[in-house]
């Protein structure tokens, strides 16, 4: 029986998809890359912002066409959109057989079997459950790097965010389970572990009574075969001395942190429900750069939040200019139903949001270009991602670059390299957000 799987949304959702793929593969289902060859389709959806919701809905409708035409035996929808709009999906898209919530993905085999039997089901476990199936994940990221989801859910309840409603409260995965999963990934050839959660920095607080990310990192560093460990989704107010110290001590931990700050105006941060201030952000970033001089900092910002004035936008611009983040992404504010921010007064016009987004990205581009110029002549360690077609060159990443969201380095060489290899490269040039180098 052939299954075509679509995974939408974030890297945390991708981990759920890989767990489901592992369960289906272990049960004997054949995973196919061609949707026209599928007997069953599974769509793992996202609904974090409006565009993600639209993409999920359109994907379901596109795949439902195969069911309507009789070319597909079963269609299963899971993930955040399924959790949030479970009954609407079943009622309005009759081609969908089974809807699985965000904490029911461990029931994917049963869901597929029910769908093949012609049943129409909505399967929702307790939103605060923490499914931990024993079956190994089917890694889809190429085999040389993988995401390790260390927790589920979120307790922050930012005013613009729907995540607690679709993912539940914060639940840390027990450390021994994560060590086991990391070892299994390494046994499959993974060399870079990327730790993810809605928030990684409070890992362990709920089950161990204290923040334990630094302890988890120490344990992961003991696993042979792991070369890099990277941290994403680190809330700046939760960065502490224990985390900084372990980053300084353990050579496997990339000197890279993803710090989603969202804004730099105290008034907007308060309206967002963020638990920090502009000065606290400055203090944290300053301390990180002092303690770990070669650290690369990534952040994300939201522009056009309700009530954001031109002066507050300019305050963000000044902050970005002063902090000189190595990596930065900007989202325009997306009002999500059932969130406090969606009903706040003074909603901003889309054109204004987009203009402000462009302002920030233009400034950031100048910062990144200057930083890239400073890299010329330096030697860097590169993880090879693949070969450039029809050229004596490869593409890879430095410790400063997370996959899919950051830049790349193009490596010129006549030597043969393999995906996942580590190579020493001398930077010889820069091209927008990417670097160019030669194998040493």
PLM regions and their residue ranges:
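Short glycine-enriched, charge-decorated loop/helix-capping segments at active-site entrances
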Residues: 47-48, 167-168, 207-210, 270-276, ...
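Terminal RNA-binding accessory module
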Residues: 343-440
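Proteins enriched for Cys/Gly/acidic motifs involved in redox and nucleic-acid/cofactor modification
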Residues: 1-203, 242, 253, 257, ...
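Short acidic/polar active-site loop segments enriched in Thr and Asp
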Residues: 191, 227, 326, 331, ...
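Short, hinge-like loop/turn segments at secondary-structure boundaries
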Residues: 93-94, 115-118, 211-213, 247-248, ...
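Active-site proximal loops enriched in glycine and acidic residues that flank catalytic Cys/His/Asp
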Residues: 197, 233, 261-263, 299-303, ...
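Conserved SAM/AdoMet-binding glycine-rich loop
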Residues: 75-76, 84, 89, 187-311, ...
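Conserved, mostly hydrophobic/aromatic
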Residues: 178, 195, 231, 259, ...
């Amino acid at each position: 029986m052939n299954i075509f799987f679509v995974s939408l949304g974030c890297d945390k959702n991708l981990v759920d998809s890989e767990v489901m793929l592992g369960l289906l593969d272990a049960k004997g289902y054949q995973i196919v890359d061609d949707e026209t060859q599928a007997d069953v389709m599974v769509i793992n959806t996202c609904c974090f912002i409006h565009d993600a919701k639209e993409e999920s809905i359109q994907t379901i409708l596109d795949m439902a066409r195969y069911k309507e035409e009789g070319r597909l035996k079963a269609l299963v929808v899971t993930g955040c959109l399924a959790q949030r709009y479970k009954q609407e999906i079943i009622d309005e898209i009759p081609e969908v057989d089974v809807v699985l919530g965000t904490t029911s993905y461990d029931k994917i085999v049963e869901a597929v079997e029910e769908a093949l039997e012609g049943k129409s089901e909505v399967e929702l476990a307790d939103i605060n459950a923490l499914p931990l199936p024993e079956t190994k994940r089917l890694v889809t990221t190429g085999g040389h790097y993988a995401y390790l989801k260390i927790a589920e859910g979120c307790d922050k309840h930012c005013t613009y965010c729907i995540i607690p409603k679709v993912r539940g409260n914060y639940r840390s995965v027990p450390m021994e389970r994560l060590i086991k999963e990391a070892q299994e990934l390494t046994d499959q050839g993974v060399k870079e572990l990327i730790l993810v959660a809605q928030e990684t920095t409070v890992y362990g607080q709920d089950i161990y009574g204290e923040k334990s990310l630094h302890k988890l990192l120490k344990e992961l560093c003991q696993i042979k075969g792991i070369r890099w460990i990277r941290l994403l989704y680190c809330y700046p107010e939760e960065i502490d001395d224990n985390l900084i110290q372990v980053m300084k001590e353990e050579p496997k931990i990339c000197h890279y942190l993803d710090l989603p700050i969202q804004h730099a105006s105290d008034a907007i941060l308060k309206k967002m429900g963020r638990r920090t201030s502009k000065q606290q952000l400055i203090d944290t970033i300053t301390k990180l750069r002092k303690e770990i001089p070669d650290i690369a900092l990534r952040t994300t910002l939201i522009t056009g939040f309700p009530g954001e004035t031109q002066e507050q936008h300019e305050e963000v611009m000044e902050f970005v200019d002063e902090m000189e983040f190595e990596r930065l992404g900007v989202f325009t504010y997306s009002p999500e139903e059932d969130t406090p921010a969606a009903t706040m007064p003074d909603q901003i016009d889309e054109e204004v949001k987009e203009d402000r987004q462009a302002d920030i990205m233009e400034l950031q581009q100048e910062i990144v270009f200057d930083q890239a110029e400073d890299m010329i002549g330096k030697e860097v360690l590169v993880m090879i991602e693949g070969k450039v077609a029809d050229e004596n060159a490869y593409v890879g990443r430095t410790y400063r670059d997370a996959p899919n969201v950051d830049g790349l380095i193009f490596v010129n060489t006549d030597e043969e390299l393999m995906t996942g290899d580590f190579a020493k490269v001398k930077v010889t040039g820069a091209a927008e957000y990417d670097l160019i180098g030669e194998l040493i």
